[in-house]
Each structure stands twice: as structure tokens, then as C-alpha cells.
């Protein structure tokens, strides 16, 4: 008798994706982040669902409904902080996942990569609208500042902003629609993740060497299921430590003050995971130029496969490219730091230099160094 796992239409899909999937025998822990992102998504949807049961998307009651969740709902504080810090863990895994893709040349699977960029944009949109929901000072002013960026679009900008707001300022209509977006987007992310996986399984996984591994494959289960479980345990441990010991470490104290349109906070800044893009936005004195740079800082990922000039896929055997890659990581950390600082000397010039270096590294230096490495191969 044939195993039901291999014959049943539904079980067969699960089997081919998570059990009998042929996987390269040498993939490292950097390949764990895909499954960790799946885990983060499930956790965020579940905690978010329980929060939505008690939250009210109305300007007069939103802030107090969050306070009510934390004070009166059984383990409400725990669910709320799991959700808030879960978002941070989500972005840590996301950036590590993208970094792995850049380092090992996974972007050469173009369909998978492009769906991944789309996923990144959707997750960023979800996190942004979610940050507005507690209706604290930073929620309100963050929403005002970021949505206002669209007014830089010539001719239709102002109309577009008022259309998104549902009025002439960020108000009740804005909060209600942002809650609706925040509820629906994670399900779109889930669907996109399934498509991401579908395209990945068309080609099979890449591996650290960047060399085809068709001749040396092992089944996903038990080898990589056990490895993913270890990663999951470490992720949960980190998340629990963050949530139970320092739940407000990554948050903004201003968000414990109810939203007040008449009082602007001294320093308006987004959550830490958007600071690098915020720093790039602020480093350009022109509004439209800043918005374009902000967009390009993320959308540049789409062009990465076209900028591949190396004969080798992975950076594993390319020391000069490795140096530039880690310079890029350091540059992004610098931008993240600058994004959280006030707009004054010396932060302005450091931010501008880091922004220039970011685009220079990706568009000019990395492709050029790859060509030089190709020449060195002939020596």
C-alpha cells in the first residue's frame, strides 16, 4: 500500500514542500531565516487576532483600548508586547534573510527574488499602518509625516494625501482604514509567501558555494526540520527575553502619550527597522528628491540581479566583494543610528555621506570589484 502522505492531494503538497523536498546537503544556518519568517508571520497573525478582539479603531477610544488590553485582559500585556516585539524579530529575520540572499547570490532566482522584494514592501506597509493603531503621539505624528511625503508627487500629490487620510488631516477615517489595512495585509503576505515558496521549489535552494547541488541532495525531513526547530527555539527564546525583561526597549516613550494634533514631539522618528530609509529620506534637502531616494533605497533590490557582473554566483570565494558587502552592512547600521538622531551637525553630513556610500556600493563599487575579481581568476 502506498503511503497516504504521497497519494492524498493535500498531503502530497505538504510532503513535496516540507518532507521529501530534495535539499542541498551543505546549507548553513543562514538558510534558517525563511522558516523563522514563517514562524514570525504565524505568531503575528495569532497575537494580532487576539488583540483585534479587544481593540477599538476609533480616535476617542483607541489609546484607552490598548491600555485596557494591558491592564484588564488576561495576559493582554503579554499578547500586546509579543506582537510589538514580534514585529522587531520579524524585521531582524527579514534583513538577515535578504543579506543572505545578497551574499550567496540567491537573487539569481529572479522570480523568487522579485516576489521577495514585493513581500518586503508589503511587510513594511503592514508595520507602518500597525504602528499608527495605538494612537499615541508617535503613532499620530509618524502617520502625518510619512503620508505627507506623497504630497511631493507633482500635480496629484495633495489630492492623493487627502484621499488616503479620508479628510484634511490624520483623523478617525485614517485610523479606521489603517486598522482595516493592518488586518488584511498579513493574509496577503501569507499568500505571497506561498507563491515565494512555489517559485523557490521550481529551482530548488541555492547553497553557500553557489555551485549547482543536484548531485548531492538530502531530504528536508529530518535533516532540516530538526535544524529549523533549533532556529525556532532560539528565536522564541530571544523574543521571550525581550518581551518579559525589556518590553519597551525598542519602542518610543512618546507613544505612551495619547495623540495630540496640537503638540508636536521634539523628534519624530519611525520604529528602528525603518530608520535607515528615514535617514536616506532626510539626507536630501529637496522633498521630492528625498521621497525618490527613500523609494529607491528599497526598490534597488529589484536591480541587484541585473548588476551581477561576477562569474561566480556566491561571495564565498570572493574576498574583495566580501569586504564591500560588510561595508554595506556597516553603512546600513550607520544609517540606522543617524535616523534616530536629531537633524543637526555632525549628524546631517554623516547621514549624507552614508546615503551616498549606500548607493555607490550597490550601483558602482560591487559590480566593478566583481569585474576585477573575474580578471584575477585568470592569473
From Swiss-Prot:
It comes from the Eukaryota. One of its GO terms (cellular component) is mitochondrial inner membrane. The chain crosses the membrane at residues 33-53, 77-98, 113-133, 178-198, 226-246, 288-308, 320-340, 347-367. Keywords: Electron transport, Heme, Iron, Membrane, Metal-binding, Mitochondrion, Mitochondrion inner membrane, Respiratory chain, Transmembrane, Transmembrane helix, Transport, Ubiquinone. A ubiquinone binds at residue 201. GO terms for biological process: mitochondrial electron transport, ubiquinol to cytochrome c. Heme b b566 binds at residues 97, 196. GO terms for molecular function: metal ion binding; ubiquinol-cytochrome-c reductase activity. It comes from Leucopleurus acutus (Atlantic white-sided dolphin). Its cofactor is heme b. The gene is MT-CYB. PANTHER family: CYTOCHROME B. It is a multi-pass membrane protein. Heme b b562 binds at residues 83, 182. Its main location: mitochondrion. This is Cytochrome b. The keyword Cell division does not apply. Component of the ubiquinol-cytochrome c reductase complex (complex III or cytochrome b-c1 complex) that is part of the mitochondrial respiratory chain. The b-c1 complex mediates electron transfer from ubiquinol to cytochrome c. Contributes to the generation of a proton gradient across the mitochondrial membrane that is then used for ATP synthesis. The cytochrome bc1 complex contains 11 subunits: 3 respiratory subunits (MT-CYB, CYC1 and UQCRFS1), 2 core proteins (UQCRC1 and UQCRC2) and 6 low-molecular weight proteins (UQCRH/QCR6, UQCRB/QCR7, UQCRQ/QCR8, UQCR10/QCR9, UQCR11/QCR10 and a cleavage product of UQCRFS1). This cytochrome bc1 complex then forms a dimer. Binds 2 heme b groups non-covalently. Heme 1 (or BL or b562) is low-potential and absorbs at about 562 nm, and heme 2 (or BH or b566) is high-potential and absorbs at about 566 nm. It is found in: Mitochondrion inner membrane. The lineage of its organism: Eukaryota, Metazoa, Chordata, Craniata, Vertebrata. PROSITE patterns: CYTB_CTER, CYTB_NTER. Belongs to the cytochrome b family.
